[in-house]
C-alpha cells in the first residue's frame, strides 16, 4: 500500500464588513498616513424651549488605514492598476447618510468642554495610523468617517470608539490567492497559449490559481510545453498541475508555489515509527503460526521451542510481504519517485495487513503511478503462487504436516480451484487432508496481497483503479468496496478490520499528479486489470462442493 497526500476547492473568499461600519471602501495603494482636521464651529441653544435644539455641523475626516505594502494577492482585474493611478487625484467617495445612525455621540458635561477642546486641539495635525487587522496583505482600506461636532466640542471619544470597532474587526478577505498579479499576467500571456491551453477564466485554488480553458493537442505534449515555458520565466518557483475538473470533467491547469507543497515534519522520526510497527508485526506473525502462544503469551518465555516452531511460517509470510514492497521500491526508483519507509501494520488474524508506504514527491502521470502500484502486488502474487504450488507438490517433511479440513479451501476461489485441480479426488467434503505447512504460509501471503489490491482508497488496488479509469470512477469503486467489505465484516473478522483500516488510514483521496489527463498505455492497463482480477480470485469464496461433480454448487 502506498500512502500519499486532492479535491478541488475553487471558492472565492467573501469580503465581510464590520456590521457597524457601512461606509467601507476598499481602495488599494492609498497613501500611508492620514490626518484629522478640526475646525471651529458655532452652536446656539434655547434652554427654555420644550425641544432642545442641537445644531450639528458635520465635517468629513478621511482616515486612511494602511498596512505594509506587499505583493498583491489575487486575480485582480485591470481596475486595480487604474485605481492606483487615480486614487491620489480623485476625491474619496462620501456616504454621509448611512453613518448618522451608526456613529456614537457622547454627551459631555458642560464643565469638561474646555478640557475637551484643549485635548482635541493637541491632536490636530497629528498622523493617525490604525491597523485594520486584515488578513490580506497589500490591500489598503480607506474608511470615510464623519466626525460630529456638538457644542463647540468634538465627540472624539465616540469617533475613536467607532474607528476602533471598525478597524479592529478582522476583514475576512480571500487569503488563498497568493500569486502576484504580475505573475498571473505572465502565465496567461506567455506561458499558456493557443497551442497548449487557452485560458478562459481563473479562480483561486489552494494558495495558487486554477485556470479554466480549452486544452489543445495531446495532454502530455501540452503539459511539457507549458512546463518548459514556466521554468524559463520563473525557474523552479512554481509547480504546474494539469488536472480534470470533477464538476464538468474538463481539463484545468493549476499553478501553485512550490513552497506550499513542502511536506510537514513529524515529531517522531519516520525510521523509529516504522521500526516499532515492524517489530509488532513480526510478533503477530509469530503469534499466527504458533497457536499455543495465542492462548498463553507468557509461555513463550518458558518454552523457546514454541518460537522456533513459528519461525519458518513467520519468515515465509514476511518474505512474500518483503518481495511485495521490494517491487514497489525498484519500480519507483526507476521512475524517480521517492518512497518513505514502509510501515508494516500488525494483525492478530493473518499476522500482518501489509505495509503503508508514503509517496514523498509528486508523481508525474497516471502511467507512472500505475507501474508503481501494480509492481508490488504482481511481485507478491508471483512469489505467493510459486510457494503455494510447491507446498501442494512437496509432501510434508515429517510425513504429517498440517492436517486441515477440506472445507478450508472454500475460503478462496483461487486457492480452492488450484487445490481441486492438483489434488483431485483427495480433496472431498467432510474429510481431512494432510498438507505441507508451506501451503498455509503462502496462502496467508496471497491473502494479504489480495486485500491490498482491493480497488479502494489509497490501497494498491485503489491507485490502480485511479490510474486506469480516473479519479471519479476510483472514488465510486472505493465506496462500493467499503460497502462490500462492510457486509463481509458481518461474517469475517478480517473483513471488519480491513474496513476500519481503509476508512481511517487509507480512504484517500489520492494526491494530485502533475498530469492526470493522459491515459496509460494498454499493456500497463492490462497488468493493472490482472492485479485486480487476482485480488478478486483470492478474496472471493470457492462456491463449488469438493465432490466428483464439479458443477454442483454448495447448498444446492
Curated annotation (Swiss-Prot):
Gene Ontology cellular-component terms listed: chloroplast; chloroplast membrane; chloroplast thylakoid membrane
Intracellular or extracellular location(s): Plastid, Chloroplast membrane
Transmembrane segments: 267-287, 311-331, 336-356, 374-394, 437-457, 484-504, 527-547
Disordered: region residues: 63-133
Keyword field contains NADP: no
Membrane topology note: Multi-pass membrane protein
GO biological process, one term: proteolysis
Transit peptide residue numbers: 1-64
Keyword Transmembrane: yes
InterPro entries the UniProt entry points to: EGY1-like, Peptidase_M50
Keywords assigned: Chloroplast, Hydrolase, Membrane, Metalloprotease, Plastid, Protease, Transit peptide, Transmembrane, Transmembrane helix
Primary site of residence: plastid
Enzyme Commission number(s) from the entry: 3.4.24.-
GO molecular function (one): metallopeptidase activity
PANTHER family on file: ZINC METALLOPROTEASE EGY1, ZINC METALLOPROTEASE EGY2, CHLOROPLASTIC-RELATED
Function (record text): Probable membrane-associated metalloprotease that may be involved in chloroplast development.
Family according to the record: Belongs to the peptidase M50B family.
Protein name per its UniProtKB record: Probable zinc metalloprotease EGY2, chloroplastic
Source organism per UniProt: Arabidopsis thaliana
The gene coding this protein: EGY2
